[in-house]
């Protein structure tokens, strides 16, 4: 009985407390929780602000580092023309080009194309390109490779036609020498070479006449075919110019994308490893592009313009990413689709250029095929370039 009397006041107090909680205003019950959330939000905002400032510092470092690395890479072959070992017809240049081709091939196959598949297969991007859907990334890469082949062929044909339609000198020293040989062999008539260029047959005929002067006649409306060593050299230079311009187009598209992606990132932990990886990436790609520019024999102005465009594209992309970082979301549907399509196109261009215009042209060169030591050195350089660029995929 006494125990019941002692417990009654406690029960009454507990009941009063429950009733007070029940009738208390909703704000009073959550005031402490709201205060805690405000403190948590303030701390999170402070951390986010510190991350943003650290990320901005790293982005500025990345702009300077990538700019310097790209410029150094593209200038190595260009300035290397002053050294006999690095001239376009030297053995060392074959190895440098093979290394650069391996870098470009790995860039397309290991870096860009998988990223394109991931972007187009992402659920945020609508699930295009992977899973049970259609592989749009592969389709775009294939279309870009075929378009590159068409541009390569059409542009080279146009430049050849425009070059060989130009007026040609009539009295060629080689023809004059051959004519002199005929005269020394017992020709009865003395004089100069009378040249008839037959476009339909694609060759020139030298006839010795008794006239005391030379004549040049051109028959037909089509240009003469490139049969002389000089014409073959011009055709090869035209091919190298087209290759270098199309290759730079593919590299520029890719450089803008990776620059914007890095510039829009807000986490220092994700930017820090990219600075070094992308610097090496731009350096190796610059070597490949610089080698093509050297072989194309561009004038100094065109060389400077192409080197400048390559060097500035990725840093400009980073600056653009910084400018739009507040509104840009790389995980949005639009961003993923655009990035996936452009990455696929860039991958198709670079894969085609590395295999067809760089590797196939050099590995079918008689100078390489008749030199076993040079062949082994070039293969080693190719595998080294592709391997080193593939290794960078761990960080970038």
Swiss-Prot record:
<feature type="transmembrane region" description="Helical">
    <location>
        <begin position="274"/>
        <end position="294"/>
    </location>
</feature>
<keyword id="KW-0406">Ion transport</keyword>
<feature type="compositionally biased region" description="Low complexity">
    <location>
        <begin position="219"/>
        <end position="228"/>
    </location>
</feature>
<feature type="transmembrane region" description="Helical">
    <location>
        <begin position="304"/>
        <end position="324"/>
    </location>
</feature>
<dbReference type="InterPro" id="IPR003689">
    <property type="entry name" value="ZIP"/>
</dbReference>
<feature type="topological domain" description="Cytoplasmic">
    <location>
        <begin position="357"/>
        <end position="375"/>
    </location>
</feature>
<comment type="similarity">
    <text>Belongs to the ZIP transporter (TC 2.A.5) family.</text>
</comment>
<keyword id="KW-1133">Transmembrane helix</keyword>
<keyword id="KW-1003">Cell membrane</keyword>
<feature type="topological domain" description="Cytoplasmic">
    <location>
        <begin position="81"/>
        <end position="91"/>
    </location>
</feature>
<keyword id="KW-0864">Zinc transport</keyword>
<feature type="topological domain" description="Extracellular">
    <location>
        <begin position="267"/>
        <end position="273"/>
    </location>
</feature>
<dbReference type="GO" id="GO:0005886">
    <property type="term" value="C:plasma membrane"/>
</dbReference>
<feature type="topological domain" description="Extracellular">
    <location>
        <begin position="113"/>
        <end position="130"/>
    </location>
</feature>
<feature type="transmembrane region" description="Helical">
    <location>
        <begin position="131"/>
        <end position="151"/>
    </location>
</feature>
<dbReference type="Pfam" id="PF02535">
    <property type="entry name" value="Zip"/>
</dbReference>
<keyword id="KW-0812">Transmembrane</keyword>
<feature type="transmembrane region" description="Helical">
    <location>
        <begin position="60"/>
        <end position="80"/>
    </location>
</feature>
<feature type="topological domain" description="Cytoplasmic">
    <location>
        <begin position="295"/>
        <end position="303"/>
    </location>
</feature>
<feature type="topological domain" description="Extracellular">
    <location>
        <begin position="325"/>
        <end position="335"/>
    </location>
</feature>
<feature type="transmembrane region" description="Helical">
    <location>
        <begin position="376"/>
        <end position="396"/>
    </location>
</feature>
<feature type="transmembrane region" description="Helical">
    <location>
        <begin position="336"/>
        <end position="356"/>
    </location>
</feature>
<dbReference type="GO" id="GO:0006829">
    <property type="term" value="P:zinc ion transport"/>
</dbReference>
<keyword id="KW-0732">Signal</keyword>
<keyword id="KW-0813">Transport</keyword>
<feature type="region of interest" description="Disordered">
    <location>
        <begin position="203"/>
        <end position="230"/>
    </location>
</feature>
<feature type="topological domain" description="Cytoplasmic">
    <location>
        <begin position="152"/>
        <end position="245"/>
    </location>
</feature>
<feature type="transmembrane region" description="Helical">
    <location>
        <begin position="92"/>
        <end position="112"/>
    </location>
</feature>
<keyword id="KW-0472">Membrane</keyword>
<dbReference type="GO" id="GO:0005385">
    <property type="term" value="F:zinc ion transmembrane transporter activity"/>
</dbReference>
<dbReference type="GO" id="GO:0071577">
    <property type="term" value="P:zinc ion transmembrane transport"/>
</dbReference>
<feature type="transmembrane region" description="Helical">
    <location>
        <begin position="246"/>
        <end position="266"/>
    </location>
</feature>
<protein>
    <recommendedName>
        <fullName>Zinc transporter 4</fullName>
    </recommendedName>
</protein>
<keyword id="KW-0862">Zinc</keyword>
<comment type="function">
    <text>Zinc transporter that mediates zinc uptake from the rhizosphere and may be responsible for the translocation of zinc within the plant.</text>
</comment>
<dbReference type="InterPro" id="IPR004698">
    <property type="entry name" value="Zn/Fe_permease_fun/pln"/>
</dbReference>
<feature type="signal peptide">
    <location>
        <begin position="1"/>
        <end position="30"/>
    </location>
</feature>
<feature type="compositionally biased region" description="Basic residues">
    <location>
        <begin position="203"/>
        <end position="218"/>
    </location>
</feature>
<feature type="topological domain" description="Extracellular">
    <location>
        <begin position="31"/>
        <end position="59"/>
    </location>
</feature>
């Amino acid at each position: 009985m006494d125990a019941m009397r002692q417990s009654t006041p406690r029960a009454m107090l507990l009941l009063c407390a429950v009733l007070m909680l029940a009738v208390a205003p909703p704000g009073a019950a959550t005031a402490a929780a709201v205060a805690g959330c405000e403190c948590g939000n303030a701390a999170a905002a402070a951390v986010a602000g510190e991350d943003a400032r650290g990320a901005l510092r790293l982005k500025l470092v990345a702009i300077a580092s990538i700019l310097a690395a790209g410029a150094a890479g593209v200038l190595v072959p260009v300035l290397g023309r002053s050294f006999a070992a690095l001239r376009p017809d030297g053995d060392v240049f074959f190895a440098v080009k093979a290394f650069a081709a391996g870098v470009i091939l790995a860039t397309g196959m290991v870096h860009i194309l998988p990223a394109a598949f991931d972007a187009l297969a992402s659920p945020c991007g609508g699930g295009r390109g992977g899973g049970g859907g259609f592989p749009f990334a592969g389709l775009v890469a294939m279309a870009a490779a075929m378009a590159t082949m068409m541009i390569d062929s059409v542009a080279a044909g146009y430049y050849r036609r425009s070059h060989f339609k130009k007026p040609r000198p009539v009295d060629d020293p080689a023809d004059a020498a051959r004519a002199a040989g005929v005269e020394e062999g017992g020709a009865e008539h003395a004089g100069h070479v009378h040249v008839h260029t037959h476009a339909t047959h694609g060759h020139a005929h030298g006839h010795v006449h008794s006239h005391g002067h030379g004549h040049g006649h051109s028959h037909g409306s089509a240009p003469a075919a490139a049969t002389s060593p000089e014409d073959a050299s011009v055709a090869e230079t035209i091919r190298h110019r087209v290759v270098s311009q199309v290759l730079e187009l593919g590299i520029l598209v890719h450089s803008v994308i990776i620059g914007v992606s890095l510039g829009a990132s807000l986490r220092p932990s994700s930017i820090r490893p990219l600075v070094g990886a992308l610097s090496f990436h731009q350096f190796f790609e610059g070597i490949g592009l610089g080698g093509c520019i050297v072989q194309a024999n561009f004038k100094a102005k065109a060389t400077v313009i192409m080197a400048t465009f390559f060097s500035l594209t990725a840093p400009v992309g980073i600056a653009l990413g910084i400018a739009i970082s507040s509104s840009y979301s790389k995980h949005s549907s639009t961003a993923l689709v655009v990035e996936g399509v452009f990455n696929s196109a860039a991958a198709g261009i670079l894969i085609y250029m590395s295999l067809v215009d760089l590797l196939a042209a050099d590995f079918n060169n008689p100078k390489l095929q008749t030199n076993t030591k040079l062949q082994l050195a070039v293969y080693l350089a190719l595998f080294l370039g592709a391997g080193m660029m593939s290794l960078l995929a761990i960080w970038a």
